[in-house]
Amino acid sequence: MTAFQPYSILITDDDPAARETLREIVAPQGYNTLMAESGEEAIDLISHHDVHLALMDMHLPKLSGLETIAIVRQIKGVIPAILITADQDDELMRRALSEHAFCVLAKPVSKHVVIYVVHKAIEKYYN
């Protein structure tokens, strides 16, 4: 399945290599990409651009991925968010669901899993 414009994905990670890896996974699928290195930058981009989905690292400087999702929800409503983290536990899963995260992916991410989950989130929210 190939994505059609104008779906835009915001990739937020404080690690430039991780951001670029995620961009290299989703951009060839036909998605526009925006990149942020912090929760604050992600909020600014979402406030000024049409963002259809967020791929967000859980551990960011200042605001966590979950805190960022909560603020975005107050500003724009629910935007499907896929959290990415190295430490999944039951409490994180509960908090992610309470903030309406679409899912939580474990690091290191699999290219095929990212593509599948992004497509499923876009289908669920926009089709």
Where are these regions (language model features)?
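Acidic catalytic/metal-coordinating carboxylates
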Residues: 38, 64-67
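Short amphipathic alpha-helix used as the core "switch/output" element in two-component signaling
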Residues: 44, 66-78
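Two-component/phosphorelay signaling modules centered on CheY-like receiver
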Residues: 16-34, 99
